[in-house]
Amino acid sequence: MSYHVYVSNAGSDYFSKFLLDTASGALTQEDNVDLGGQPGAVATNADGSLMYICLRSAKTYQSYRVNKVTGQLNLINKVDVPQGGPYLNTDNTDRFLMATYYGAGAVSVHKINGDGSIGEKPLQWIETEVHAHSIQFDRSNQYAYVPHTNPPNSIYQFKFDEITGELSANDPHKVQPETPEGPRHFVFHPSKDLLYSVNENGSTVSAHHFDANTGQLISFQVISTLPDDFDGENNTTAEIRMTQDGRFLYASNRGHDSLAIFDVDEDGSLTSIGHQATEATPRYFDFDPTGTYLLSIGQTSGRMATYLVNREDGSLEPMATYEVGDSPLWIQFVPKE
């Protein structure tokens, strides 16, 4: 099977475009996708037929229909927003588009219409606090979480109505680490009620118990992403991912320029098992949809590195590097038909 791979380049006006052969892990570079503005965050619906892109320089969200044979993007519509947000995501029904606003300190909800277009006006604009960085939903689609780096060093907790698209404050409305860790992004365990946040300011990962009945998070571990001999003042973290079987967790270090690798115990606790050197300033990385390969982009190197994932011990075997655009910050996969 093959996948279209799009790399969002914040310093260029285009996506870098590749075709991934999952049998070999090889990437074939194709023509860039011109977007007419500097792209940032990207989201798709579940089958990859619709793509939503934040053009940060133009302050717009744009909806595209994806030709899954060729990978071509066909514009459906675009809507103006006060500022380009650092994160886009759809809820689990693909009926609503969520965005966070780092500078404004807010979350928005837009309706996704039947034709894939984005509703012109947001259904909701919720002020939280400055440095709102991402938003994701639990498996039930009943709860959403918005991490904020330090300050305010908190994760906002919301209830979500998947019929109306309304977000409402859970009780308590936010949880805060005891130390200024600065939660940025997070992942849920694939089968257990656990949530892991990567913390930008503290260069740490926090493990949380997730109460599926109330939506509440309770932290039970904070662990460093860095080797003991590296000065944390020279590092921030960026992205976090977990293998499909829930055995290994990875977090990116900007400064140490590595992917921290953790073993996940049966009780959800983490143990550091090593670091893999990667491209400079690894703002984003992700597994391909099969979980066989990991792709990591360097925001300051302008390159993407690929790795073969060892499913037995979690280690990463370097495979190849590819030139992309300026300041890459997102990777999106779409299955090829």
Feature locations, PLM:
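Short loop/turn segments immediately following the C-termini of beta-strands
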Residues: 10, 56, 102-104, 112, ...
